[in-house]
């Protein structure tokens, strides 16, 4: 059976990994994240690798390999060739839904592209330093980042991310939900937002916000507990980031009991 592979690459960008070079057929990016970089616009990108033969299983991929009556019987796999998938998205999906990025958002995202590689270097550099601090902090029970040898995906990280992965990760603080929120509320330059991959450092408590509608079993499957804190490390100076995490106040990690 023919199967196409689609990769959602919202948390990583082409500067770190190129999924099509590893066999992906379709790659989806959230331009709102690293591409724009400032959480100021909404947009997305769909990249068609152009290597998948949609006609080899015409029944399964009938929208691409069989005639489209709304276009006088045109077969997208014949008319557009390697670009059949993205061509149908523009010709049919956009036609039917009317989705279109605003010119101003497009302008902002294009500006973001100009500094993408530079920003990502700083994101990754900062994130690895925060991970290194947290993993050695006695008030932290676990850090979930693939760069760490005990992470279940560490081997994949070493294989596919020789330049380092993204800057979004979680950790478990000792003391449960109460201590998690004490820590979150104490952070000053971190913004409490559900967005990620912003130049601003972001923090959130998934258990009571983004994933609060999940059942206990679903939360367990996602390894989300009352102690889980998600960080999206920004491009601020690393000394400023670490100083916020490590200030001698009862609400900060160095003295949480």
Regions found by a protein language model. Name each.
Residues 119, 176, 185-186, 201-248, ...:
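PLP-dependent enzyme catalytic core of the Aspartate aminotransferase-like
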Residues 1-13, 246, 250-257:
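Single conserved hydrophobic/aromatic residue that forms the stacking wall/gate
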Residues 47, 170-172, 232-234:
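Short hydrophobic/aromatic beta-strand micro-patches
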């Amino acid at each position: 059976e023919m199967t196409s592979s689609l990769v959602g690459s919202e948390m990583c960008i082409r500067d770190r990994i190129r999924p099509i070079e590893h066999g992906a057929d379709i790659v989806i990016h959230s331009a709102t994240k690293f591409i724009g970089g400032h959480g100021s616009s909404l947009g997305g990108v769909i990249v068609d690798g152009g290597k998948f033969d949609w006609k080899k299983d015409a029944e399964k991929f009938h929208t691409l390999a069989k005639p489209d009556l709304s276009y006088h019987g045109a077969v997208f796999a014949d008319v557009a060739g390697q670009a059949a998938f993205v061509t149908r998205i523009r010709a049919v999906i956009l036609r039917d839904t009317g989705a279109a990025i605003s010119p101003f958002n497009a302008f902002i995202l294009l500006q973001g592209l100009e500094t993408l590689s530079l920003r990502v270097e700083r994101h990754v550099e900062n994130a690895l330093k925060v991970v290194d601090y947290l993993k050695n902090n006695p008030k932290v029970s676990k850090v979930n980042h693939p760069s760490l040898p005990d992470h279940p995906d560490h081997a994949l990280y070493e294989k596919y991310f020789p330049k380092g992965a993204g800057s979004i990760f979680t950790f478990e603080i000792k003391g449960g939900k109460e201590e998690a929120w004490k820590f979150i509320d104490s952070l000053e330059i971190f913004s409490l937002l559900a967005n990620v991959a912003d130049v601003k450092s972001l923090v959130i408590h998934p258990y009571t916000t983004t994933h609060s509608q999940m059942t206990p079993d679903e939360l367990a499957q996602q390894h989300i507990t009352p102690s889980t804190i998600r960080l999206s490390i920004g491009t601020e100076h690393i000394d400023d980031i670490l100083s916020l995490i490590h200030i001698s106040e009862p609400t900060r990690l160095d003295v949480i009991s």
